[in-house]
């Protein structure tokens, strides 16, 4: 069914404006039949952040910003779904056009600007689907016009704690002016201290909801030293590596679009984000698991991220070019690799290549 859907939908969606195509995809998923996915190979099961994942392949934040279709995505075979980025108040984001396909590079540039319907609307949808279970994380951010951005994060932690499987603190989007400044040492330490404190205040009522930190791939190694040290000292539960990049490789072929302002994702991000996963893994020293994101478009790419240090992986841009069937393809490739190598779980290979990757010349 998914293959047939991809065969029909992908060519049609390519004719549409990227943002209109995305909106249509969300509407289509809301109509997806309530069919249970095939059971995952037991060898793909992962335990991380105190949660049990049936498989390691998730969908990254940005696809389902307003929690309109998390259950359809879970039925398509994703091991987990991350909704958002959600801000306390609704906001329209940046003016259109703000989403661009770089088709020859299998990449996307976006400058969306945290467009979303706000916490109240997302909370209502998550409450309505709570009975269905599944791992649904909430990616939280600050409103562009906020006078106290840290207070925005705290408010969202308190609001969503009863319903979120985990939180992602997003301080790495390049499309909200000044947001990435929250990755600087003093600001990040204050933010994480207040976020973790908020989580502790609601623990009795909401449980111990894991808090993850999502970082940019454009950090220097010195900056990464500080970020990981602070994340460890503030006892975050994990990190997501990495968000979109502001860098533009000279090898990009879509010369007319490559200089559009915004964050670049997709295949050209793969090498940089994989290096950042490995660098973070080495610095974390097992303190917490990582989710690897950036340019994953095949089972081989997912395996490379895992061997670099990712316990879980997330996709988004590759779905634009490969379709929803990519999820099952990646899982099949990972299971086949485990069978062929005689391993019982992916945990046995997490970070196996990190020392080799980090020994390569920097920058990549």
From Swiss-Prot:
Substrate binds at residues 65, 110-114, 170, 175, 243-244. GO terms for molecular function: dihydroorotate dehydrogenase (quinone) activity. One of its GO terms (cellular component) is cytoplasm. It is found in: Cell membrane. It is a peripheral membrane protein. Pathway: Pyrimidine metabolism; UMP biosynthesis via de novo pathway; orotate from (S)-dihydroorotate (quinone route): step 1/1. Pfam families: DHO_dh. Its EC number is 1.3.5.2. It catalyses: (S)-dihydroorotate + a quinone = orotate + a quinol. Its cofactor is FMN. PANTHER family: DIHYDROOROTATE DEHYDROGENASE (QUINONE), MITOCHONDRIAL (PTHR48109:SF4), DIHYDROOROTATE DEHYDROGENASE (QUINONE), MITOCHONDRIAL-RELATED (PTHR48109). Catalyzes the conversion of dihydroorotate to orotate with quinone as electron acceptor. Belongs to the dihydroorotate dehydrogenase family. Type 2 subfamily. This is Dihydroorotate dehydrogenase (quinone).
């Amino acid at each position: 069914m998914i293959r047939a859907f991809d065969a029909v939908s992908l060519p049609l969606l390519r004719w549409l404006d990227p943002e209109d195509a995305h909106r249509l995809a969300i509407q289509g998923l809301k109509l997806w039949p309530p069919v249970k996915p095939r059971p995952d190979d037991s060898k793909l099961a992962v335990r991380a952040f105190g949660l049990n994942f049936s498989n390691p392949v998730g969908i990254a934040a940005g696809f389902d910003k307003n929690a309109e279709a998390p259950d359809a995505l879970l039925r398509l075979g994703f091991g987990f779904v991350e909704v958002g980025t959600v801000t306390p108040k609704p906001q329209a984001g940046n003016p259109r056009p703000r989403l661009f396909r770089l088709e020859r590079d299998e990449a996307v540039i976006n400058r969306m600007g945290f467009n979303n319907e706000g916490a109240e609307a997302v909370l209502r949808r998550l409450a309505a689907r709570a009975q269905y279970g599944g791992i649904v994380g909430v990616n939280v951010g600050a409103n562009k016009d906020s006078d106290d951005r840290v207070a925005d994060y705290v408010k969202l932690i308190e609001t969503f704690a009863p319903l979120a499987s985990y939180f992602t603190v997003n301080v790495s989007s390049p499309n909200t002016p000044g947001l990435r400044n929250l990755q600087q040492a003093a600001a990040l330490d204050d933010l994480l201290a207040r976020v973790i404190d908020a989580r502790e205040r609601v623990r009795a009522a909401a449980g111990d909801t894991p808090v993850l930190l999502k970082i940019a791939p454009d950090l220097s190694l010195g900056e990464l030293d500080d970020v990981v040290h602070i994340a460890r000292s503030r006892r975050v539960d994990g990190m997501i590596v990495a968000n979109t990049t502001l860098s533009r490789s000279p090898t990009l072929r879509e010369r007319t679009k490559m200089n559009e302002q915004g964050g670049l994702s997709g295949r050209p991000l793969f090498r940089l984000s994989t290096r950042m996963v490995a660098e973070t893994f080495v610095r974390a020293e097992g303190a917490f698991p990582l989710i690897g994101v950036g340019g994953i478009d095949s089972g081989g790419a997912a395996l490379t991220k895992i061997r670099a240090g990712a316990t879980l992986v997330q996709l988004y841009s590759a779905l634009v070019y490969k379709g929803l069937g990519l999820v099952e393809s990646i899982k099949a490739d990972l299971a086949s690799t485990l069978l062929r190598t005689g391993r019982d779980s992916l945990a046995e290979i997490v970070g196996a290549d990190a020392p080799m990757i980090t020994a390569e010349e920097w920058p990549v």
